[in-house]
């Protein structure tokens, strides 16, 4: 899969490709471009724009580990980004990959090549800072999980990505917290991952069924925010409404009251202990 990376100070400075439709998401700002003969997924994070060009589909020896089958490549254009490119691209926004609250969206996440590397970097930084404070590591590692979002049309990819992220988190959590590790926190972690990694179509903004066909349910993202020392707030928004919000800043930027009422952007909100977020399913 061909790819390139471009650093810009403003997403609006990017040239508009001819015949291409763009939708921007403020914050981690991710946008999708589509025309008749190619698809391009561009992820804008902290002034870095990553382009994934879906035209080249030949499977050389180097690319074989990047595909699951020729049929999936032909039917879905499914080609995974190699580890070398993943790390090189993450290095462009290295500081953001260390912040537990810096949000990332991968609108075609596959089994989590990008999200897993970002999570590992976030957890490594938390471990460096809070090695002697298991409680702080526990709380902030949950926040780090809540900062990662992914959408994929293939259900097996979604399940694999969720499990991959959980295992990475659980290994670090268990190693650092030892006997203080809690199954209740593990359940909360699985719940957050399940909410954030969605089986859906990022082009139509709808959830899909087991065959990859659109359902009537829209893709909904949850914003996870720590309040005080132990409370976590979850706020739900539809992806389609987030795409309609053009204010720059955070993905979940504060919205005006009339936007909330007229656009129906905000769906629901819960506040609870970070260990008990799964109780509001």
Residue ranges and their predicted role:
Residues 48-49, 57-281:
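SAM-dependent methyltransferase catalytic region
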Residues 18, 38-39, 47, 51, ...:
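Low-complexity, intrinsically disordered or signal/transmembrane-proximal segments
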């Amino acid at each position: 899969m061909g790819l390139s990376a471009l650093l810009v100070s403003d997403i609006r400075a990017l040239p508009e490709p001819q015949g291409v439709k763009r939708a921007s998401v403020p914050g981690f700002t991710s946008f999708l471009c589509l025309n008749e003969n190619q698809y391009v997924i561009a992820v804008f994070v902290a002034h870095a724009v990553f382009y994934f060009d879906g035209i080249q589909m030949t499977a050389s020896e180097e690319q074989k580990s990047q595909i699951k089958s020729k049929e999936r490549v032909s039917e879905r254009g499914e080609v995974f980004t190699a580890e070398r490119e993943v790390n090189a691209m993450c290095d462009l926004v290295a500081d953001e990959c260390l912040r537990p609250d810096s949000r990332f969206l991968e609108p075609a996440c596959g089994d989590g090549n990008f999200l897993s590397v970002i999570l590992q970097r976030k957890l490594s930084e938390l471990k460096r800072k809070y090695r002697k404070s298991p409680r702080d590591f526990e709380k902030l590692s949950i926040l780090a999980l809540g900062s990662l979002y992914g959408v994929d049309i293939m259900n097996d990819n979604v399940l694999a990505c969720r499990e991959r992220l959980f295992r990475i988190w659980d290994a670090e959590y268990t190693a650092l917290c030892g006997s203080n590790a809690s199954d209740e926190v593990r359940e909360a972690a699985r719940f957050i991952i399940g909410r954030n990694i969605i089986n859906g179509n990022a082009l139509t903004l709808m959830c899909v069924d087991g065959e990859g066909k659109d359902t009537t349910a829209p893709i909904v993202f949850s914003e996870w925010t720590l309040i005080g020392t132990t409370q976590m707030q979850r706020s739900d928004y539809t992806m389609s409404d987030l795409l309609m919000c053009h204010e720059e800043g955070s993905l979940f930027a504060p919205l005006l009251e009339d936007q909330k009422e007229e656009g129906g952007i905000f769906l629901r909100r819960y506040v609870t202990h970070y260990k008990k977020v799964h109780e509001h399913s």
